[in-house]
């Protein structure tokens, strides 16, 4: 799923830009 983060998600930060984009991260 995706959760709001308040900052841009990057793969290096363990996030999924492909699925979530701005202000969202995989959990």
Curated annotation (Swiss-Prot):
Cellular localization per UniProt: Secreted
Annotated positions for site Hydrophobic/aromatic residue important for potent activity: 8
Keywords: Disulfide bond, Hydroxylation, Ion channel impairing toxin, Knottin, Neurotoxin, Secreted, Toxin, Voltage-gated sodium channel impairing toxin
Keyword RNA-binding belongs to the record: no
Cystine pairings recorded for this chain: 2-16, 9-20, 15-26
GO annotation, cellular component aspect: extracellular region
Tissue expression as described in the entry: Confined to the epidermis and to the mucus layer.
A GO molecular-function annotation: sodium channel regulator activity
UniProt KW Secreted keyword: yes
Extra remark: Negative results: does not show effect on rat Nav1.8/SCN10A.
Function text: Highly potent toxin against both insect and some mammalian sodium channels (Nav). It potently inhibits inactivation of insect sodium channels of B.germanica (BgNav1) and also delays the inactivation of mammalian Nav with potent activity on Nav1.3/SCN3A and Nav1.4/SCN4A. 1 uM is enough to completely inhibits the inactivation, resulting in sustained non-inactivating currents. In addition, the toxin significantly enhances the recovery from inactivation, and the open state is not required for the toxin to interact with the channel.
Domain comment in the entry: The presence of a 'disulfide through disulfide knot' structurally defines this protein as a knottin.
Name assigned to this protein: Nemertide alpha-8
Protein source organism: Riseriellus occultus (Ribbon worm)
């Amino acid at each position: 799923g995706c959760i709001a983060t308040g900052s841009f998600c990057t793969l290096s930060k363990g996030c999924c830009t492909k699925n979530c984009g701005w202000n969202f991260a995989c959990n």
